[in-house]
């Protein structure tokens, strides 16, 4: 669990996301409260539930990115789902409980990676010994049994040194490696994904792993053997228990497009996937127990972050019970031309930095001037204002259009330099930005 302070969390988010300080503060406090809760006595810890968050703001302003970066900082199981994919039980569409099943799968994978990393050093030692055994087979006695190998024989040490220095990487050896059986693919009918997953797991367990003698290069053999030895050192049952604990106490669920399941006005007849979908979400958010293939998972302390543009519906159109389960409301502002300019240059691995690096692979030098960046930002903002506002995603469209010619001809123009200044941007995008009809189709 992350021990970062709210100020440190906001500072880290600032490296990737421009603006939206209120939203960053809200998620930073929510994450720190996770750590604070774990410091409490058991009796009080059970009573402290997370304060779920509702993010309100237009598309492309950073709602999803904030949640995604937060999960990375926390090193916590994280899943993003679309609210519109889930319907009432009995209708075509996924059941909401599959959110927790998918989150548990993510947690198992995350915990497995962490466990493998812990035993990696020991696994590398064991893999090295197996490769040395293949290079220097131990002598056999009169009955054909392998004699006790000499761990520190001078020949073995010479080969060990060469192996560690990479001198034997391309040499081929024959080793016994575990070959997983091909899984049985079962097409799942809607709503029965969990059952088909269990059937697939059953078939794989029945088949098991078989050992097969394979000829391979030493560098490839080492990779395969390290994974095999690490898997032997990891206790799978403990790993599942740890993963479930991780989900229950650190899991984060991001529910996007929650405004699309609001009931709009007076609608008669069955309102499939709207109010029914909200009512199905309620037990998950307020706390229930979900059965997964890894075990039972309680959702009482999972943090839920819901988001929506709320351009047609309003937060008050959500059913009252759900509104009460999302007590923290954060409004994200639409991005200005100045925000676009900062997005192009300030974040780590910014868009302009990415394009410069991509062109360098073709020996083409691309430079973005300050007035060029301002012109790109203004163009993106203007198109957003005159057509549909898609936020920062408009920058991708504008930049792709701007760099189209350079990207296409890069192979023939190796060694050349291009300066993207205001004049270049106007020449490439000026007409498209001014003509609203063209903007709608091309930008």
From Swiss-Prot:
| Pfam families on file | AAA, AAA_2
As for subcellular location, the record says:
Cytoplasm
One Gene Ontology term of the biological-process aspect is:
protein unfolding
Under InterPro entries, the record lists:
AAA+_ATPase (IPR003593), ATP-dep_Clp_protease_ClpX (IPR050052), ATPase_AAA_core (IPR003959), Clp_ATPase_C (IPR019489), HslU (IPR004491), P-loop_NTPase (IPR027417)
Assigned GO CC terms: HslUV protease complex
- Record-annotated residues binding ATP? 18, 60-65, 256, 321, 393
Tell me which stretches of the chain form a coiled coil.
none
Recite the UniProt keywords alphabetically.
Answer: ATP-binding, Chaperone, Cytoplasm, Nucleotide-binding
Tell me which CDD domains the record gives: RecA-like_HslU (cd19498)
Main location group: cytoplasm
Q: Name one GO molecular function term.
A: peptidase activity
Q: How does it assemble?
A: A double ring-shaped homohexamer of HslV is capped on each side by a ring-shaped HslU homohexamer. The assembly of the HslU/HslV complex is dependent on binding of ATP.
The record's similarity note reads:
Belongs to the ClpX chaperone family. HslU subfamily.
What is the documented function of this protein?
A: ATPase subunit of a proteasome-like degradation complex; this subunit has chaperone activity. The binding of ATP and its subsequent hydrolysis by HslU are essential for unfolding of protein substrates subsequently hydrolyzed by HslV. HslU recognizes the N-terminal part of its protein substrates and unfolds these before they are guided to HslV for hydrolysis.
Q: Which PANTHER family match?
A: ATP-DEPENDENT CLP PROTEASE ATP-BINDING SUBUNIT CLPX-LIKE, MITOCHONDRIAL-RELATED, ATP-DEPENDENT PROTEASE ATPASE SUBUNIT HSLU
The name under which this protein is listed is: ATP-dependent protease ATPase subunit HslU
User: What is the name of the gene encoding this protein?
Assistant: hslU
